[in-house]
Amino acid sequence: MRVPVLITMLCCTPSFAQEALPAPTEFQYPLAVVAQSDGVVFVADRNLPGIWKIENGQKSVYFLASKKFRTPLNAVRCLAIDHQGKLLAGDSSTREVYRFDDAGLPQPLTKGWIGIPMALAVASDGTIYTADLELHRIWKMPAEGAAEPTEFAVINSPRGLTLDPDGNLWVLSTSSKDGQIQKVLPDGKIESVIKDHPFNLPHNIVRLDDGTMFVTDNYEHCVWKVSSDGKPEKFVSGAPLDRPVGLCRSGENLLVADPHIRTIFLLAPDKTLTVLVSSPVDPVATAAPVPEAGTPPTAPAK
């Protein structure tokens, strides 16, 4: 008699867990940004977790990851657009780099080879470079991916990557003894560009065709401009910026992700800052993510 009774109870149990939750509508911790050539913008949200798509000034969830650790993009940290216009994303939860397919699903490119992917850069031939903050390496792999990417350079605390037209890779470091900006030639030779440490907590770097570079600095509440001869100066500083992290090119402008105020700014060449899209600030939601096991003891975004 117990079996029929149990079945009846299960059938009568309300299916609250099966009810679909409403789609998120607001940023939680937007820390990385990338723009397509057509103006569509993608934003990595560490605390959502997942990726937003911004089109015509409106944001929508592009990919909603699980909150379960060791699942794809549970700890998304960086984005890039590849040579064919596909979205790439680096995730420290699964130690992986993903490419989104035509169905909008992330497909892994390695077999969990990356430690903490902090930045991605893609060459014109599709070669993918990944900055690994945990292993202090720059990994290189072909467009189709590789089970074990090739070690391209060893640089301490790499956080940002950008390529120039000649195929040189520019690496932004937090604390390397060889300086905070280093250039890696196609043959792997490393040259120090900024040999000292003018940046407080740099996160991302962008290089323009004329050699000018820009760097987000979380602790200095600013975006730096670095001249082609390697001289840094603060380009924009203070309000409305709070603690900028993400940075990318968008036409002649830059896009800046400021996670603590849940805002994506558009930064024009004349230093004008305008809000592309933002969400109301929630002190709890914008708290810095809890470091994961294996995360090196570097300062978190503030």
Regions of interest found by a model, annotated:
Residues 24-38, 69-84, 112-125, 155-167, ...:
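Beta-rich, blade/repeat-based domains predominating
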Residues 57-98:
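Mid-chain, structured segments of secreted extracytoplasmic proteins
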Residues 54-58, 100-105, 141-146, 184-189, ...:
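Short loop/turn segments that connect beta-strands within beta-propeller blades
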Residues 4-14:
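Bacterial N-terminal signal peptides
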Residues 41-47, 87-93, 128-134, 169-176, ...:
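Conserved beta-strand positions in repeat-built beta-propeller and related beta-rich domains
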Residues 18-44, 48-52:
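An edge-strand/N-cap motif at the start of beta-rich repeat modules
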Residues 50-52, 96-98, 137-140, 180-182, ...:
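A short loop-to-beta-strand structural motif that recurs across blades of beta-propeller domains
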Residues 18-24, 60-69, 105-111, 147-152, ...:
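A short beta-strand motif characteristic of beta-propeller blades
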